[in-house]
């Protein structure tokens, strides 16, 4: 049984009902409907911390979905799961793929910056100030791009850029 048919959460049930109604009204192909169902089930599983199940649903949604914009969000969510699992290299790969399909995805840029900043902090802890600066500069680059796309969404990142003197670069 699809996850969307066994939701116990009122909000999830409501979303599922509304989404099902929209899928009936909006002219879409059966393939698009199936892709959306897998995507929706992936989001539901992800929100409950069921990452393996979420990934299976997202991979199936990717197999079915042909629209690059919709694929970008599937890829972004796969990146989120890999980030949560500490698999930063994989996460970065999926964020890059998402941005290739949808360059206006500031949240992917932000998450890439957060990973780079984290790697910079790790380098400092290991006494590697040279690599930490490389990671911090990369984080700054991603945050600047995210801020350009969504100016009011990343205030903390903007403050970090100012404090570290990276805002002007």
Swiss-Prot record:
<dbReference type="InterPro" id="IPR011990">
    <property type="entry name" value="TPR-like_helical_dom_sf"/>
</dbReference>
<keyword id="KW-0150">Chloroplast</keyword>
<keyword id="KW-0802">TPR repeat</keyword>
<feature type="repeat" description="TPR 1">
    <location>
        <begin position="35"/>
        <end position="68"/>
    </location>
</feature>
<feature type="repeat" description="TPR 3">
    <location>
        <begin position="120"/>
        <end position="153"/>
    </location>
</feature>
<keyword id="KW-0793">Thylakoid</keyword>
<keyword id="KW-0677">Repeat</keyword>
<comment type="function">
    <text>Essential for the assembly of the photosystem I (PSI) complex. May act as a chaperone-like factor to guide the assembly of the PSI subunits.</text>
</comment>
<keyword id="KW-0934">Plastid</keyword>
<keyword id="KW-0472">Membrane</keyword>
<dbReference type="GO" id="GO:0015979">
    <property type="term" value="P:photosynthesis"/>
</dbReference>
<comment type="similarity">
    <text>Belongs to the Ycf3 family.</text>
</comment>
<dbReference type="GO" id="GO:0009535">
    <property type="term" value="C:chloroplast thylakoid membrane"/>
</dbReference>
<keyword id="KW-0602">Photosynthesis</keyword>
<feature type="repeat" description="TPR 2">
    <location>
        <begin position="72"/>
        <end position="105"/>
    </location>
</feature>
<protein>
    <recommendedName>
        <fullName>Photosystem I assembly protein Ycf3</fullName>
    </recommendedName>
</protein>
<dbReference type="InterPro" id="IPR019734">
    <property type="entry name" value="TPR_rpt"/>
</dbReference>
<dbReference type="InterPro" id="IPR022818">
    <property type="entry name" value="PSI_Ycf3_assembly"/>
</dbReference>
<dbReference type="Pfam" id="PF00515">
    <property type="entry name" value="TPR_1"/>
</dbReference>
């Amino acid at each position: 049984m699809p996850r969307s048919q066994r939701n116990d959460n009122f909000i999830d049930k409501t979303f599922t009902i509304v989404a099902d109604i929209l899928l009936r009204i909006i002219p879409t192909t059966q393939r698009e409907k199936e892709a959306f169902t897998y995507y929706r089930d992936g989001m539901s599983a992800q929100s409950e911390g069921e990452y393996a199940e979420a990934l299976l649903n997202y991979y199936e949604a990717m197999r079915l979905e042909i629209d690059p914009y919709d694929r970008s969000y599937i890829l972004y969510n796969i990146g989120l799961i890999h980030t949560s699992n500490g698999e930063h290299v994989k996460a970065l790969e999926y964020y890059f793929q998402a941005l290739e399909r949808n360059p206006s995805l500031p949240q992917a840029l932000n998450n890439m910056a957060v990973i780079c900043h984290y790697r910079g902090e790790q380098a400092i802890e290991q006494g590697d100030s040279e690599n930490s600066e490389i990671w911090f500069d990369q984080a700054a680059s991603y945050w600047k791009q995210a801020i350009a796309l969504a100016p009011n969404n990343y205030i903390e990142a903007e403050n970090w850029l100012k404090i570290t003197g990276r805002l002007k670069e």
